[in-house]
């Protein structure tokens, strides 16, 4: 198979072709035991669902974390950025899953059709747009699809070797469902080793546009934890892939990686339980005040956060 230099670099250096690590057979059970033993006696909001957003909120400010737990945020509504992101991932799904090669424009159009059919909120947003606004979003999806195809080997042609899966929702239920840890993977590559099941053969990739942020590494570690709990074996590597430059930040998964992620889940469960008992949240001002539902009444809120975020977004 003929590949360009960027495609070959992604295949050889990120996806990799070398030996994969083998993990102990009891790894998933030890992770589960660590979490369940730490939180079993807590008064949890039941069920307590934790994903990357809530864990990141806790790392910023307990007040923001509590507001999300309490469902205080207004109902989600699509905007240009969220709609573009949804269509971008759907277009990549179309490209990878198609029987025949598709050009980026066709993939983008199919992504719209399928998303309108499957997601009511997106359909309402899309129907309310003018034709020029729809065209503008579609062209951004086309651009991102071109960047993806120029960065990765042709996954459609490598389905047998890499078993690509896109937009894969996963969750791990703990304590009989009282605690649920979940995530959605942009791209999962690799097939299980049937002869040696505890060999880690998968890589989980989060597709990104824009700049890198510190929380991306923690997000990926959480994905590794949920995969380990769900499938019994973790991925060998997790990565954030930046489409504009064809670059990535990756981390090879080790047991320490997984137990670190498990400890973040434990910390969040303990925080949720103690605030449920009446403890006041620890308040930390920052850029997140711009989107916190409690900003107008919070004594620690940064009054200039919204203005700064708006300036940074327009820069």
Where do the model's predicted regions map?
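C-terminal, charged and often intrinsically disordered regions of DNA end-processing helicases
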Residues: 1-81
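Metal-dependent nuclease catalytic regions and adjoining charged, substrate-binding loops involved
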Residues: 1-15, 19, 212-217, 227-315
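Anion-coordinating catalytic cores for phosphoryl-, nucleotidyl-, and glycosidic chemistry
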Residues: 55-56, 171-174, 185, 287-290
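Short, hydrophobic/amphipathic alpha-helical patches that form generic packing surfaces
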Residues: 64-68, 86-97, 225
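Hydrophobic (often cysteine-bearing) scaffold residues that line and stabilize catalytic clefts
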Residues: 80, 84, 88, 134-137, ...
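Conserved phosphate/pyrophosphate-binding and hydrolysis machinery centered on Walker-type P-loop NTPases
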Residues: 81, 131, 282
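A non-catalytic, helix-rich entry segment at domain boundaries
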Residues: 90-167
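Mg2+/Mn2+-dependent nuclease catalytic core
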Residues: 163-265
